From Swiss-Prot:
GO terms for cellular component: chromosome; cytoplasm; DNA-directed RNA polymerase complex. SUPFAM superfamilies: RPB6/omega subunit-like. DNA-dependent RNA polymerase (RNAP) catalyzes the transcription of DNA into RNA using the four ribonucleoside triphosphates as substrates. HAMAP family: RNApol_arch_Rpo6. Part of the RNA polymerase complex. Disulfide bonds: none annotated. PANTHER family: DNA-DIRECTED RNA POLYMERASE SUBUNIT K, DNA-DIRECTED RNA POLYMERASES I, II, AND III SUBUNIT RPABC2. This is DNA-directed RNA polymerase subunit Rpo6. It comes from Thermococcus kodakarensis (strain ATCC BAA-918 / JCM 12380 / KOD1) (Pyrococcus kodakaraensis (strain KOD1)). Keywords: Chromosome, Cytoplasm, DNA-directed RNA polymerase, Nucleotidyltransferase, Transcription, Transferase.
Length: 57
């Protein structure tokens, strides 16, 4: 898996949690009653978040 900096990781998880909170479908099976942030963390750990990081060359 690609190594992200702590800043990239925070931005990816935060952005995905916001998407989930606004009604985006969760891409993995999650237990009922889970928060959007927890769902985003689970997605990040499984590597299924559809967000790409582009670094300058």
């Amino acid at each position: 898996m690609f190594r992200y900096t702590r800043f990239e990781k925070a931005r990816i998880i935060g952005a995905r949690a916001l998407q989930i909170a606004m009604g985006a479908p969760v891409l993995i099976d999650v237990p009922e009653g889970i928060t959007p942030l927890q769902a985003a963390l689970l997605e990040f750990e499984k590597g299924v978040i559809p967000i790409t990081v582009i670094r300058p060359s």
